[in-house]
Curated annotation (Swiss-Prot):
Entry protein name: Hemoglobin subunit beta
Species classification: Eukaryota, Metazoa, Chordata, Craniata, Vertebrata
Alphabetical keyword list: Acetylation, Heme, Iron, Metal-binding, Oxygen transport, Phosphoprotein, S-nitrosylation, Transport
UniProt-listed InterPro entries: Globin, Globin-like_sf, Globin/Proto, Hemoglobin_b, Hemoglobin_oxygen_transport
Assembly notes: Heterotetramer of two alpha chains and two beta chains.
Name of the gene this protein is made from: HBB
Organism field: Varecia variegata
Entry's Gene Ontology molecular function annotations: haptoglobin binding; heme binding; hemoglobin alpha binding; metal ion binding; organic acid binding; oxygen binding; oxygen carrier activity; peroxidase activity
Length: 146
């Protein structure tokens, strides 16, 4: 794994407290609000007309949970992120044509949401460890683009 044992401990101890549904929905919602061009991939999700509409949209929340569930699975396979995310990379690259930069943006938004939810428990060391993880996941998801 690319994390030190200490970094891995920071990630796993915090992740055990994460509400995947709540954090996932908020992270995806914030991505769509902060980076509005990402909305074009979610036109079938209904009302994305305002920040309130996006944050309250049940399809955004459901897909956010799905995204974070996959991310959670990746945390169990940090030594093989490319393999773990190969099918999702293929789907997002070949079928959905998602700009791989969006994976990095979502990772950064996830770090912000975790900091927001956990406050003082989200130490600089924890942030650094999570930043490594979201970068690794983003790179794995972008793998099929190379």
């Amino acid at each position: 794994t690319f994390l030190t044992p200490e970094e891995n401990n920071h990630v796993t101890s915090l992740w055990g407290k994460v509400n995947v549904e709540k954090v996932g929905g908020e992270a995806l919602g914030r991505l769509l609000v902060v980076y509005p061009w990402t909305q074009r991939f979610f036109e079938s999700f209904g009302d994305l007309s305002s920040p309130d509409a996006i944050m309250g949209n049940p399809k955004v929340k459901a897909h956010g949970k799905k995204v974070l569930t996959a991310f959670s699975e990746g945390l169990h396979h940090l030594d093989n992120l490319k393999g773990t995310f190969a099918q999702l990379s293929e789907l997002h690259c070949d079928k959905l044509h998602v700009d791989p930069q969006n994976f990095k943006l979502l990772g950064n938004v996830l770090v912000i949401v975790l900091a927001h939810h956990f406050g003082n428990d989200f130490s600089p060391q924890t942030q650094a460890a999570f930043q490594k993880v979201v970068t690794g996941v983003a790179n794995a998801l972008a793998h099929k683009y190379h």
